[in-house]
C-alpha cells in the first residue's frame, strides 16, 4: 500500500484525445486521485491535446465538469479540484497537419528536463501520424515514454504493422501498451497469492487442479461504440487482450524476479504454449453468441441488431472458448473462457477448481463433498474467496458444508482501492513496465486468435442468440457441461 503515497518526480503528461471519452471518464479522475494522495510534486503538468479549439481556462472548466460528473460522492473537493486544474494546460493540435505542434513544443520546452509521457487516447488510425509528428518536432527526450491504448491491430498483420510504425519512432523500452485490467489490485494479488505463499504453488498444476474458468461479463450493450464494435466483436475486443492476459497470470511459471522483462518472458511462454484452434475443432471448443431483446438493470433493452444501424450482422457479442495449454504444468487442464455484452451482470473473475478428494471416508449422510475452489474477483467488489468443506455445527452427527473464506479488499483494508488507471498512469512515470504488454506478447496473442477467426469464416460458424440479461447462449452451457462441469455464475 506504500506505493500509493510515494511521490513521483515532476512530469509532463500529454494526453492526445484530451477532450475525449477516455480522458473525461478515466484519465482525468485517475490523475486527480493521485494528486489527492500526495503523489504529485511541483511543477507537474497535464496537457490536453486535441483538434478542439479551447483555451487553457476552457479546458480547466471541461476537466472540472468531468470530475464533478465522474467522481464518486464525497470525492469532489473544491480546493483540491482548483489545485488540480491549475496544473492543466491545453493545446489544439491536428495529427494530420502542422497545426498546433509548434505551440506544443514551446509549452514542453518549459519542462525539458522532466519525465515526459505522451498518452495516445485516440484511435489507432492516427497513432502513426502522432508518433511521426512527435519525432519530427523533436519532442522526444531521454526520459520520454509513449502510452498506447488497445486495440493493437485487428489481426497479426495489422498489429505487426502498428508495432513497426510506433517502433520506428520509439524504442521498445519507451512504449507502454496499456491493458487496464492488469492495473487491478486483484491481478497483482494473484502474483502475491501464488509466489508469496507456500500454500498454493505446490498445488498449482494438473495434478491438483481440475479446471480454470475466466469470465468477463458486461451488462451494457453497445454504448455508442457500434462503429468499432461491429467490426471487432467479442473475440478481438476482449479475448485477445484482457482475457488472455488474465490467463497468462494464472498459468505462468514463477519469474526469476518481479522485473518487468522476467514477468513478461513467462507470460510469453504461456501464449506460445496455447493449443491451436483450427477449422477441425473450432465448433467443438468455441461458441459465438449475439444478444437478443431482453431485460437489463430492471428494464427492457433492445437486441444487438435493433441497436445496430442496418440491422444485419454476424458479429459475436459473446464468445466462450475451451482453451488448453500444451506444457508440463497444465497438460489436461481445460481453461474455460467467456465474455459477452448484455449478460446477467457485470463481473470479472477467475475461478480455479481443484480436483475432488481421491476417496471419501464419510457416510452418505454427511452430504456431498464439493471440490475446493479459489475465486479471484476483479469486479465488482475486488477480493479473493476460498471455498472449504467443514463440519456443520451441532450435535446431529457429521454433516458437511461448503463454506467460503471471503476477503473483500474494501473491507479488509482501511484505504480507498485505487482505480487501475491510477496505478498504471504513474507506473509509466516510474518507468515500470511490469503491468504493460510487450510487443511479442501482443503478436503471440494474435497468432492464437487469428486461426480462430479464420476457422469461423471457413466453417461458417454462426452466432447463437441469447436473451439480454442472461449468461449467454445455451450452447455455451453445453460447452462446459459435456465435460461434466458447470459455469460459476454467482455475482
Curated annotation (Swiss-Prot):
This is Glucose-6-phosphate 1-dehydrogenase. InterPro entries: G6P_DH, G6P_DH_AS, G6P_DH_C, G6P_DH_NAD-bd, NAD(P)-bd_dom_sf. Keywords: Carbohydrate metabolism, Glucose metabolism, NADP, Oxidoreductase. It comes from the Bacteria. GO terms for molecular function: glucose-6-phosphate dehydrogenase activity; NADP binding. Belongs to the glucose-6-phosphate dehydrogenase family. One of its GO terms (cellular component) is cytosol. Substrate binds at residues 180, 184, 218, 237, 341. One of its GO terms (biological process) is glucose metabolic process. Catalyzes the oxidation of glucose 6-phosphate to 6-phosphogluconolactone. Pathway: Carbohydrate degradation; pentose phosphate pathway; D-ribulose 5-phosphate from D-glucose 6-phosphate (oxidative stage): step 1/3. Its EC number is 1.1.1.49. The active site is at residue 242. PANTHER family: GLUCOSE-6-PHOSPHATE 1-DEHYDROGENASE (PTHR23429:SF0), GLUCOSE-6-PHOSPHATE 1-DEHYDROGENASE G6PD (PTHR23429). It comes from Rhizobium meliloti (strain 1021).
